[in-house]
């Protein structure tokens, strides 16, 4: 690359801005045609995708990448199938662009409503997983946004191969190539440039480790849609149904350990702890979950429960480790969650309607649940189709970010020669 990284990124930004204006007025059928053509291109390019991915895997092994990172990097046949199906699924989702709602007449006689419109240009910064290239590109395309994708250097060949399939889909639908651009330099300065171009980029969505997201949040000159941690809680109320409590608390922790919506701390009302914790602890022990608890929990469950420290309450383990605290009541549970939680997803297990309502009202999280596992906090499970990420911020998008989260609204006003007096 002969041009500087800054010049290169500025060129991508200019091209994306121009493409975004064309995408904003593209018909739904045209966008869907691009998505379906890209899916067909992926299907036809399986050998090419596998070859490119093997280059990345070989480099990763040579560079000492951890097994978990190599697993995330791998494009297995099943994952290619999922990417193809993901593109086709997004094509079936309702197009939010152009929808007008809340139309009303005001005393002056004019009619006012809100129209849903694209954000413009979305920058996506992510690590390892090549499938994110498809998730992000498909959602941005369907919502009328141009996107600049900066994947991890460890996945550069895989991302470039995927991008070629997307470009083929765009070309077949008559959409600009710059609607979806993959950053082709592995120079880390590209990230700094991407997050510092408010004239070209309207929002950044980082997906990766906490260090990456903290850096982007600190340095970005454009808005960021993000979440830092997934410190999720389940609170078992004194009025909980025991079978529901055990089933939900088991699933919330052990269904998968790595996702950001996995429970990390279990809170239990003192009035039900002796009935619910021993059978739950037996399940956790059988599944190899390390338990850490406060003094009351250790007294009840035995010395093999490690002492929970202040740091444990603030930790997202992403591992078979669970912190447990016995609390005096609902108020103490809410206080704990709002003090130590990450405003991601928290659940109460109770048959008491008033307690459920209070929990919903007072827990300050993006998703708050009653008698359901925190593992449901996901765009697909919420009926949004694919998601571009989960936001714990309070402005613009909160919770799983699907198509609607990648849009904004503008006021539209209709009159008949009306003038203000």
UniProtKB/Swiss-Prot annotation:
**The keyword Transferase belongs to this UniProt entry's keyword annotation:** no
The main enzyme category here is oxidoreductase
Report one GO cellular component. Answer: cytoplasm
Query: Could you give a GO molecular-function term held by this entry?
Result: glutamate-5-semialdehyde dehydrogenase activity
Kindly list the places in or outside the cell where this protein is found, as annotated in its UniProt entry. Answer: Cytoplasm
What PROSITE patterns does the record point to? Answer: PROA
Which pathway is recorded for this entry? Amino-acid biosynthesis; L-proline biosynthesis; L-glutamate 5-semialdehyde from L-glutamate: step 2/2
Alphabetical list of SUPFAM superfamilies matching this protein: ALDH-like
Q: Which InterPro entries would you find in this protein's record?
A: Ald_DH/histidinol_DH (IPR016161), Ald_DH_C (IPR016163), Ald_DH_N (IPR016162), Aldehyde_DH_dom (IPR015590), G-glutamylP_reductase_CS (IPR020593), Glu-5-SA_DH (IPR012134), GPR_dom (IPR000965)
- Bilayer-crossing residues are none
What's any GO biological process attached to this entry? L-proline biosynthetic process
EC number(s) on file: 1.2.1.41
Q: Which reaction does it catalyse?
A: L-glutamate 5-semialdehyde + phosphate + NADP(+) = L-glutamyl 5-phosphate + NADPH + H(+)
Q: Give the family this protein belongs to, as stated in its UniProt record.
A: Belongs to the gamma-glutamyl phosphate reductase family.
Q: Extract the NCBIfam families matched here.
A: PRK00197.1, proA
Output the HAMAP family linked to this UniProt entry.
Answer: ProA
Function according to Swiss-Prot or TrEMBL: Catalyzes the NADPH-dependent reduction of L-glutamate 5-phosphate into L-glutamate 5-semialdehyde and phosphate. The product spontaneously undergoes cyclization to form 1-pyrroline-5-carboxylate.
The name this protein goes by in its record: Gamma-glutamyl phosphate reductase
Q: What is the lineage of its organism?
A: Bacteria, Pseudomonadati, Pseudomonadota, Gammaproteobacteria, Pseudomonadales
Q: Gene of origin? A: proA
